[in-house]
Design a protein with these regions (language model features):
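Residue-level detector of anion-binding/catalytic polar loops
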Residues: 28, 78, 153
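Mid-to-C-terminal Rossmann-like scaffold of FAD/NAD(P)H-dependent oxidoreductases
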Residues: 102-173
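Well-ordered beta-strand scaffold positions
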Residues: 34, 51-52, 94, 152
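Rossmann-like dinucleotide-binding cores of NAD(P)H-dependent redox enzymes
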Residues: 1-37, 121, 141-149
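A structural signal for short hydrophobic beta-strand segments in well-ordered beta-sheet cores
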Residues: 35-38, 83, 89, 173
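Conserved N-terminal Rossmann-fold NAD(P) cofactor-binding segment
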Residues: 24, 36-45, 49
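FAD-site-proximal beta/loop scaffold in flavoenzymes
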Residues: 42-47, 53-127
Length: 173
Protein backbone atom coordinates (compact mmCIF):
# COMPACT_ATOMS: atom_id res chain seq x y z
CA UNK A 1 0.00 0.00 0.00
CA UNK A 2 1.16 3.47 -0.87
CA UNK A 3 1.89 5.91 1.99
CA UNK A 4 0.22 8.61 -0.12
CA UNK A 5 -2.77 8.26 -2.44
CA UNK A 6 -1.51 7.43 -5.93
CA UNK A 7 2.10 7.33 -4.73
CA UNK A 8 3.10 4.44 -6.98
CA UNK A 9 1.35 5.93 -10.02
CA UNK A 10 2.02 9.66 -9.90
CA UNK A 11 5.16 11.73 -9.24
CA UNK A 12 5.34 12.86 -5.59
CA UNK A 13 4.10 16.42 -6.24
CA UNK A 14 1.06 15.26 -8.21
CA UNK A 15 0.25 12.50 -5.69
CA UNK A 16 0.39 15.04 -2.85
CA UNK A 17 -1.93 17.41 -4.72
CA UNK A 18 -4.28 14.52 -5.53
CA UNK A 19 -4.46 13.47 -1.88
CA UNK A 20 -5.03 17.09 -0.82
CA UNK A 21 -8.13 17.25 -3.07
CA UNK A 22 -9.70 14.48 -0.98
CA UNK A 23 -8.65 16.01 2.35
CA UNK A 24 -9.94 19.46 1.33
CA UNK A 25 -13.30 17.84 0.49
CA UNK A 26 -13.51 16.32 3.98
CA UNK A 27 -12.58 12.77 3.01
CA UNK A 28 -10.54 10.97 5.67
CA UNK A 29 -8.00 8.83 3.85
CA UNK A 30 -6.08 6.07 5.57
CA UNK A 31 -3.06 5.23 3.46
CA UNK A 32 -0.22 2.79 3.90
CA UNK A 33 -2.47 0.04 5.31
CA UNK A 34 -4.41 -2.92 4.03
CA UNK A 35 -7.98 -3.67 5.06
CA UNK A 36 -8.17 -7.04 6.79
CA UNK A 37 -11.95 -7.08 7.30
CA UNK A 38 -15.12 -4.99 7.14
CA UNK A 39 -18.12 -5.60 9.38
CA UNK A 40 -21.51 -3.91 9.34
CA UNK A 41 -22.95 -2.71 12.64
CA UNK A 42 -24.83 0.57 12.98
CA UNK A 43 -21.94 1.93 10.95
CA UNK A 44 -19.18 0.07 9.18
CA UNK A 45 -16.21 -1.22 11.15
CA UNK A 46 -13.01 -1.52 9.18
CA UNK A 47 -10.14 -3.53 10.63
CA UNK A 48 -6.71 -2.63 9.27
CA UNK A 49 -3.69 -4.90 8.97
CA UNK A 50 -2.11 -3.37 12.10
CA UNK A 51 -5.20 -4.08 14.25
CA UNK A 52 -6.62 -0.55 14.21
CA UNK A 53 -10.43 -0.51 13.95
CA UNK A 54 -12.05 2.42 12.15
CA UNK A 55 -15.73 3.35 12.20
CA UNK A 56 -17.17 4.77 9.03
CA UNK A 57 -20.46 5.86 7.52
CA UNK A 58 -19.35 4.51 4.15
CA UNK A 59 -16.36 2.53 2.93
CA UNK A 60 -14.71 2.82 -0.46
CA UNK A 61 -11.85 0.38 -0.93
CA UNK A 62 -9.47 0.64 -3.86
CA UNK A 63 -8.34 -2.94 -4.22
CA UNK A 64 -6.97 -3.26 -7.73
CA UNK A 65 -7.95 -6.13 -9.94
CA UNK A 66 -6.64 -9.57 -10.74
CA UNK A 67 -7.88 -11.06 -13.99
CA UNK A 68 -10.04 -14.15 -13.56
CA UNK A 69 -8.57 -16.53 -16.10
CA UNK A 70 -9.97 -19.93 -15.04
CA UNK A 71 -12.08 -20.32 -18.18
CA UNK A 72 -9.13 -19.45 -20.43
CA UNK A 73 -6.85 -21.83 -18.55
CA UNK A 74 -9.46 -24.61 -18.75
CA UNK A 75 -9.64 -23.98 -22.51
CA UNK A 76 -5.87 -24.46 -22.75
CA UNK A 77 -5.12 -20.83 -23.62
CA UNK A 78 -1.84 -19.17 -22.68
CA UNK A 79 -2.27 -17.06 -19.54
CA UNK A 80 0.36 -14.66 -18.21
CA UNK A 81 -0.99 -11.68 -16.27
CA UNK A 82 -4.18 -12.10 -18.30
CA UNK A 83 -5.09 -13.96 -21.46
CA UNK A 84 -2.23 -13.62 -23.94
CA UNK A 85 -3.31 -12.32 -27.36
CA UNK A 86 -1.55 -11.30 -30.56
CA UNK A 87 -1.79 -7.95 -32.34
CA UNK A 88 -5.20 -9.01 -33.74
CA UNK A 89 -6.42 -9.87 -30.21
CA UNK A 90 -6.51 -13.59 -31.03
CA UNK A 91 -5.48 -16.08 -28.39
CA UNK A 92 -3.35 -19.08 -29.29
CA UNK A 93 -6.62 -20.76 -30.32
CA UNK A 94 -7.44 -19.07 -33.65
CA UNK A 95 -11.18 -19.28 -32.92
CA UNK A 96 -10.95 -17.34 -29.63
CA UNK A 97 -10.30 -13.61 -29.13
CA UNK A 98 -9.90 -11.71 -25.86
CA UNK A 99 -10.25 -7.99 -25.19
CA UNK A 100 -10.46 -5.50 -22.35
CA UNK A 101 -9.06 -5.75 -18.84
CA UNK A 102 -8.27 -9.45 -19.18
CA UNK A 103 -6.21 -9.26 -22.41
CA UNK A 104 -2.40 -9.18 -22.26
CA UNK A 105 -1.47 -7.71 -25.64
CA UNK A 106 1.54 -6.27 -27.51
CA UNK A 107 1.61 -2.45 -27.44
CA UNK A 108 4.12 -0.55 -29.60
CA UNK A 109 4.88 1.91 -26.78
CA UNK A 110 4.37 -0.11 -23.60
CA UNK A 111 5.50 -3.54 -24.80
CA UNK A 112 3.40 -6.52 -23.76
CA UNK A 113 0.90 -5.20 -21.24
CA UNK A 114 -2.57 -5.48 -19.70
CA UNK A 115 -4.52 -2.29 -19.04
CA UNK A 116 -7.51 -1.86 -16.73
CA UNK A 117 -9.36 1.20 -18.01
CA UNK A 118 -12.51 1.96 -19.96
CA UNK A 119 -10.62 3.60 -22.85
CA UNK A 120 -8.64 0.46 -23.57
CA UNK A 121 -11.59 -1.88 -22.99
CA UNK A 122 -13.79 0.10 -25.41
CA UNK A 123 -11.19 0.45 -28.15
CA UNK A 124 -10.01 -3.14 -27.78
CA UNK A 125 -13.55 -4.54 -27.81
CA UNK A 126 -14.29 -2.75 -31.08
CA UNK A 127 -10.99 -3.94 -32.58
CA UNK A 128 -11.64 -7.54 -31.50
CA UNK A 129 -15.08 -7.39 -33.12
CA UNK A 130 -13.55 -6.13 -36.37
CA UNK A 131 -10.90 -8.85 -36.20
CA UNK A 132 -13.56 -11.53 -35.66
CA UNK A 133 -15.40 -10.15 -38.70
CA UNK A 134 -12.30 -10.63 -40.86
CA UNK A 135 -10.36 -7.37 -40.57
CA UNK A 136 -6.61 -7.75 -40.90
CA UNK A 137 -5.87 -4.47 -39.10
CA UNK A 138 -3.79 -4.95 -35.94
CA UNK A 139 -4.74 -3.29 -32.64
CA UNK A 140 -2.42 -0.28 -32.31
CA UNK A 141 -4.21 1.95 -29.80
CA UNK A 142 -1.97 3.03 -26.92
CA UNK A 143 -4.34 3.45 -23.99
CA UNK A 144 -5.04 6.59 -22.07
CA UNK A 145 -6.33 6.83 -18.53
CA UNK A 146 -8.34 9.64 -17.04
CA UNK A 147 -10.34 10.58 -14.02
CA UNK A 148 -12.06 13.60 -12.56
CA UNK A 149 -11.94 14.14 -8.82
CA UNK A 150 -13.53 17.11 -7.06
CA UNK A 151 -13.53 19.14 -10.26
CA UNK A 152 -9.93 18.38 -11.19
CA UNK A 153 -9.45 16.24 -14.29
CA UNK A 154 -6.26 14.34 -15.11
CA UNK A 155 -5.31 12.36 -18.17
CA UNK A 156 -2.35 10.11 -18.88
CA UNK A 157 -1.09 8.20 -21.89
CA UNK A 158 1.02 5.09 -21.46
CA UNK A 159 2.02 3.60 -18.13
CA UNK A 160 1.19 5.19 -14.79
CA UNK A 161 4.34 4.64 -12.75
CA UNK A 162 5.89 7.18 -10.38
CA UNK A 163 9.40 5.96 -11.23
CA UNK A 164 9.06 6.99 -14.88
CA UNK A 165 9.94 10.41 -16.26
CA UNK A 166 6.68 12.35 -16.32
CA UNK A 167 5.63 15.60 -17.90
CA UNK A 168 2.89 17.53 -16.14
CA UNK A 169 0.92 20.21 -17.96
CA UNK A 170 -1.53 22.40 -16.06
CA UNK A 171 -4.36 23.83 -18.09
CA UNK A 172 -5.87 27.07 -16.82
CA UNK A 173 -9.48 28.20 -16.76
Amino acid sequence: PDPILGGSQFPAQIASEYQKLFADAGVHLVTGHRVSSVRKHENAEVALDDGIILEADDVVAGLGATPVTNLAEDAGLTVDNGVVVDEYLRTDDPAIWAAGDIANYPDSVLGRTRVEHVDNATMMGKAAGRSMAGSDTPYTHTPMMYSQVFGVRWEAVGALDASLQTTSVEVGD
